[in-house]
Curated annotation (Swiss-Prot):
Family, similarity comment: Belongs to the EFR3 family.
Composition bias type Low complexity, residue spans: 800-811, 867-891, 1085-1108, 1116-1126
Stretches with biased composition (Polar residues): 899-912, 928-940
Organism per entry: Chaetomium globosum (strain ATCC 6205 / CBS 148.51 / DSM 1962 / NBRC 6347 / NRRL 1970)
GO BP field: protein localization to plasma membrane
Record gene name: EFR3
Protein name (database record): Protein EFR3
UniProt-annotated stretches for the region Disordered: 484-503, 800-824, 861-940, 953-1160
PANTHER family: PROTEIN EFR3
Compositional bias ranges of the Acidic residues kind: 1054-1065
Length: 1191
């Protein structure tokens, strides 16, 4: 019967059955007959139509063998399938469904031996499978995913494959089997990119085998996995018997756990082997060069972590040094290291998307904390994320901060005052429970904000392009600005409000609907994020990954329009803003920023624009080559920042912490920017010194006085002139005030740390001033402004004198460009390249008012917009009125190298000729002085006028401090006729003072030219009598000015440049005869331009000449008399010394009648009246003595 049945079978069935050897029922490790298997493979390969029938027959036989527990037959069937797949891989789609059906039957048997035997078949199936079949047949795809799911479930540590809980060794065998199947899928290049759903099933099972509370265990697994990869990736062998004896010939590098004798130790070793296999599986998934696979695996990893967080598992913890660690952070970083370099950014982007999709509720805040910690750990690591869009990630983080601060129930409203320790809490139990929840919610929200701002800072760890840091900070500051389109010209409008309350209201009105940081907590978070960016981008110790990278400095222009944050109503915002600015000054400025910047010079292209500009110049014509590049807009940040400092000193004078904050900010500005900050800070400080007398209480006066003299103290330290008379005067006054307790404790040098000054806006313990000393002592002001400026200029010249640097080898992007702008001065001469530019010197000596600063910024902004909107500008083609040609066809601006004549100077030249009398040849063109307006009326029109100038009879026009200078017509009330009654020129003093340094500029004047006039300081609010000025004791500290004392005058002093013996500077001029001097001594009258003379002075009649000579004699007598009496102005800051050694002052306030013409000043008479003893140092006679009147 059996023989008849065998003869009736088809040939393929007969060939298959001949492959099965005769074995016992329970036999294992059975192999097919080799000769019959070879014939079967030849038959299947030669007749492909029979392969599908072979697969169907094997499927039926496997079902019978599995039912009868014929393990040997099942093993033979699996080996036949493996041989068929490897022999005919192209025909696999014909019987692939049968293979999956056989594997599914074996998996359902729950027999560990049969399932382990199916792994080689599944590996061959995954290796040779065609992915197109999965895409074409959805039923087949579902069948494949079912098999993968069943294999993956075997690796679970929580679910059991059998009906009963297996023993430890059996459980490890099940898990290893599942992990091997997962590794087969991950290793297949064809199946890895087909269905991402398989990783949703496989990755969680892998992570379960890697889950541990010991991070060191993960390091061991990773080390062993990497070692196995280097040694060839040999698969782990099956667990051997515990009784195995190690022979002497065996290798000595055995795991020490394997040498133990107990089963527990062997179980630990087996557990470690399973973990290594799981680590290899996870690595195999992430190393694939498939971005979709990396994305799917990352999503599965994040889901697993979120499940563990919801189960109250600790996946992230903070170390003692503040760094985040934990299982989640470790696995996230490992996945990023394994991923291909070009696909690593996919992991971070996936994590950011997961963070944005998480519901933002108090219950889910822990999920946000964990995700933010993982993102921050990846950003701050040494893993390079090539291809990452930094700005997109930054905007996502900012958007998430916005969501956090807009959560219902502001965290600030949930704060409650803690009860005293040791006393029972009077609140009820339900109230306490609610309070605990509220406090926990506040703490978690703070933690989320802290981690988000740290993530923003960690974005700066790796620099992927030159302007990355600048773009990041600019984006954050743009979100902080009240309006989206905020410009420099609009920033002064926001500064017109004096009080913080009005500024807050204006800010609320101007805030854009999409403005991000309307809340105080968000402003603080943004400013701290900026500080974090600056700290991370400029580490004290460079990372190895950033040594070869270069980037651009963060320019000062990004801070334009942000100074209003210093005037915010909340003290923490003011402190955070000052901290961010000081961090920028500390980390982003270089030694080049300490040098004086000359805005009047030609702008220089950025380094990275040089190559492009050079290539462009080769391709353009000569006409277009004359076109200049667009100027970099000038920053007004320092001007407006000092204005905000001035406002804060007045508005927040009640808070000592605000004074300390301003002291720290001013000290950092002086330390890092030098004269570039002093040019704006010194006039403001002198203006603030004048406002001390307006303070209502003694403590207010002490605070303002400490801030003012603290600034002077900084100058003496930074510019190293403590040993001069000026420096000793400043330090002696500081010592005197400290001895009288008229000083704020924190105003010191070196400055205290910002974290130690407390929170601005908080009232601290008020120091008690001694009442007896308040009535008797006074704060002596410092008024030697000209001498102080000369000390600063001289020290600057000495400190900047250094050997010239060699040019850079290539114009590549470097890290040495200054912050204050890309404009550099033209090639200077040897004598003046290290001197302070004259317009900066004049600015330090100029008046300072709040309105003048705002007007100057507005005027400069309008000028920049007008000049930038047309092709012919002053800085480019010189097509405007200032840059036009003179009448003789000569362009005076083209050849003038002195910055005095520039139209962008803050103040006009104060010499009669304004430095426009250039040194020229006697046979060349006649010197044509080019004033600010370039008007022909301001030129020397006759020889008689030249005689008047050289003899000193033609006085310079009054110096003005506005944006419009020398624009009055002939009928102006401030003309030369009423020169004696001009309130801006009441004091005229020589500048020979003890401790003062003569002003040696690079402008060489003739010895007979009149001295240059400079303002010293703004006049005091409150008149000071002559007796007080001469050495009176003055009023007490708590004195307050009366309305009668509020008359204001302006005091000027002449800084004589001295005689210059340089014959090359000015051509020699023959001496003028006495008769000609008498003829030219008339009082000029007319326009302050100095270019026209009235008809009375130019008349050839003898009567007019006699009147001029009489006027000349009266002028000489009046000048000598004026030099012998004290000034009648309110208070001359140069007359503080007392005695015969104080500087002299002259005044024309009490001249003749109204019909009397103003006299001309005789230079010889003026020089004869100078005291020869001026300049001698007698202790503190002229500086800091008690003879000064108080505020």
């Amino acid at each position: 019967m059996n023989a008849i049945q065998q003869k009736c079978r088809p040939k393929h069935q007969v060939l298959v059955l001949k492959c099965y050897p005769r074995t016992a029922k329970g036999a294992v490790d059975v192999k097919p007959n080799s000769s019959e298997l070879s014939y079967l493979l030849f038959y299947a390969q030669s007749r492909r139509s029979k392969i599908q029938k072979v697969g169907s027959f094997l499927e039926k036989k496997t079902a019978s063998d599995v039912w009868r527990q014929r393990i040997g037959n099942v093993q033979v069937t699996l080996q036949i399938l493996t041989a068929l797949i490897e022999k005919t891989p192209k025909d696999l789609p014909l019987f692939a469904s049968c293979v999956l059906q056989i594997l599914e039957q074996i998996l359902k048997s729950r027999d560990i031996t049969m399932v382990e035997s199916s792994i080689p078949t599944f590996e061959a199936f995954c290796t040779h499978h065609d992915p197109t079949s999965l895409l074409a047949d959805q039923a087949y795809l579902r069948q494949y995913l079912d098999v993968v799911q069943q294999y993956a479930s075997l690796a679970s540590t929580r679910a059991f494959a059998g009906k009963l809980e297996p023993s430890k060794p059996i459980a490890l065998r099940w898990r290893n089997t599942g992990l091997k199947a997962i590794k087969s899928v991950a290793s297949s290049d064809s199946l890895s990119s087909v269905a991402t759903q398989q990783y949703d099933l496989a990755v969680p099972m892998i992570l379960e085998n890697l889950w541990t509370d010991n991070e060191d265990f993960l390091d061991v697994l990773h080390q062993r996995a990497e070692m196995g990869e280097k040694l060839g990736g040999a698969l782990l062998r099956r667990r051997t018997s515990v009784a195995t004896v190690q022979t002497a010939e065996s290798e000595s590098n055995t795991n020490p756990i394997a040498l133990a004798d107990t089963a527990v130790d062997m179980d630990k070793l087996a557990e470690e082997d399973t973990g290594v296999l799981a680590m290899e599986c996870l690595r195999q998934i992430f190393v694939a060069t498939n971005r979709s696979q990396v994305h799917a695996a990352t999503v599965a990893l994040l889901k697993f972590i979120q499940e563990r967080v919801s189960q109250q598992e600790e996946v992230v913890r903070t170390d003692s040094d503040g760094r985040d660690s934990g299982w989640a952070v470790k696995m996230f970083l490992l996945a990023a290291r394994w991923a291909p370099v070009a696909d690593r950014f996919t992991i971070l982007v996936t994590a950011m998307d997961s963070l944005a999709q998480q519901p933002l509720t108090d219950e889910a805040l822990q999920q946000h904390i964990v995700l933010a910690a993982m993102i921050g750990a990846l950003l701050r690591s040494d893993i390079n994320l090539i291809g990452l869009s930094v700005m997109d990630v930054l905007l996502q983080l900012i958007a998430h901060i916005r969501k956090v601060v807009q959560m219902p129930g502001d965290p600030n409203s949930m704060r409650s005052e803690p009860h005293l320790p040791g006393e029972p809490d009077p609140r009820a139990q339900t109230v306490l429970q609610f309070a605990d929840k509220a406090e926990q919610a506040v703490a978690e929200r703070k933690n989320v904000l802290l981690r988000l701002q740290e993530c923003i800072g960690d974005l700066a760890t790796h620099v992927y392009y030159a302007d990355q840091i600048s773009d990041m900070i600019s984006t954050i500051l743009q979100k902080l600005r009240p309006t989206r389109s905020n410009s420099i010209s609009g920033s002064p409008h926001g500064d017109k409000s004096d009080t913080p309350k009005s500024s807050v209201n204006a800010l609320a009105d101007e805030h854009h609907a999409d403005s991000l940081f309307a809340l105080t907590v968000a402003k603080i978070a943004a400013l701290r994020a900026i500080k974090s960016v600056l700290l991370v981008a400029n580490p004290r110790t460079k990372m190895s990954g950033n040594l070869g990278l270069s980037r651009s400095h963060v320019p000062i222009q990004i801070w334009d329009g942000t100074q209003w944050l210093l005037k915010d109503q909340d003290g923490l915002v003011r402190k955070a803003y000052a901290d961010a600015v000081m961090t920028w000054l500390d980390r982003e400025t270089t030694s080049a920023d300490w040098k004086a910047r000359d805005e009047t010079a030609r702008p220089m292209l950025k380094t990275r624009e040089l190559q492009g500009a050079a290539l462009a110049k080769r391709a353009v014509s000569s006409a277009s080559a004359r076109e200049k590049p667009v100027k970099v807009p000038r920053s007004h940040f320092l001007q407006l920042l000092h204005l905000a400092i001035y406002d804060n000193a007045i508005d927040y004078i009640d808070y000592e912490t605000d004074i300390l904050l301003l002291h720290l900010l001013l000290a950092k500005l002086v330390d890092k920017l030098g004269v570039n900050a002093v040019r704006y800070g010194l006039p403001m400080i002198f203006r603030l010194q004048e406002d001390i007398q307006d303070a209502e209480t003694p403590i207010h006066k002490v605070r303002l006085g400490s801030l003012v003299h603290g600034y002077f103290w900084m100058l003496t330290e930074k510019f190293d002139f403590e040993g001069t008379v000026i420096g000793r005067a400043i330090h002696n006054e500081i010592v005197r005030r400290r001895s009288k307790n008229f000083w704020v404790d924190g105003v010191n040098l070196p400055v205290p740390l910002l974290d130690l000054i407390g929170t601005p806006g908080t009232v601290q313990r008020q120091p008690k001033l001694p009442s007896d000393e308040i009535e008797s002592e006074a704060l002596l002001p410092f008024d030697e402004r000209l001498a102080l400026v000369e000390c600063v200029c001289t020290a600057y010249q000495e400190q900047t004198t250094s050997p010239p640097q060699s040019p850079a080898a290539s114009p590549g992007r470097s890290f040495s460009h200054p912050m204050l702008g890309s404009t550099t001065s033209a090639i200077p001469s040897i004598e003046t390249e290290h001197e302070v530019p004259d317009h900066i010197r004049e600015q330090m000596l100029s008046e300072w008012t709040r309105e003048a600063v705002l007007a100057a910024v507005q005027t400069a902004s309008k000028t920049a917009s007008l000049s930038g909107s047309r092709s012919g500008t002053t800085g480019t083609n010189r097509l405007n009125a200032n840059g036009g040609l003179a009448a003789n066809g000569h362009n005076p601006r083209a050849e003038r190298s002195s910055p005095h004549g520039s139209g962008t100077n803050l103040r006009p030249s104060t010499s009669p000729m304004g430095d426009a009398m250039r040194k020229s040849s006697l046979r060349g063109h006649s010197p044509t002085p080019a004033s600010n307006n370039g008007d022909a009326k301001e030129q020397v029109t006759s020889v008689e006028q030249l005689k008047l100038v050289l003899s000193g009879h033609l006085q310079p026009p009054p110096t003005m401090h506005g944006p419009t200078t020398f624009q009055h017509d002939d009928s102006s009330s401030d003309s030369l006729v009423s020169y004696d009654m001009t309130p801006s020129e009441l004091s005229f003093n020589p500048a020979t003072l003890p401790g003062a340094i003569p002003d040696h500029h690079h402008h060489h004047h003739h010895h007979q030219s009149p001295p240059q006039q400079r303002p010293v300081s703004r006049d005091r609010k409150g008149s000071v009598s002559a007796s007080a000025s001469a050495g009176g004791s003055g009023g007490p500290l708590n004195s307050h000015p009366t309305p009668d004392d509020m008359y204001n005058n302006s005091e000027y002093v002449s800084a004589d440049d001295g005689d210059d013996d340089d014959d090359d500077a000015v051509p020699p001029v023959p001496p003028i005869p006495t008769g000609l001097m008498a003829e030219g001594g008339g009082s000029p009258s007319g326009s302050p331009r100095g270019g026209r003379l009235p008809s009375s002075s130019s008349s050839p009649s003898s009567k007019a000449q006699q009147q001029h000579q009489q006027h000349h004699e009266r002028a000489a007598a009046a000048a000598v008399a004026a030099l012998r009496r004290p000034s009648t102005s309110k208070r001359s800051v140069k007359s503080r010394g007392g005695g015969e050694h104080r500087a002299l002052s002259s005044s024309w306030a009490s001249m003749g009648g109204e019909d009397e013409k103003a006299p001309g000043m005789d230079l010889n008479a003026l020089l004869k009246g100078i005291d020869a003893h001026v300049g001698e140092d007698q202790g503190l006679g002229g500086f800091g003595g008690v003879a000064r009147p108080p505020y």
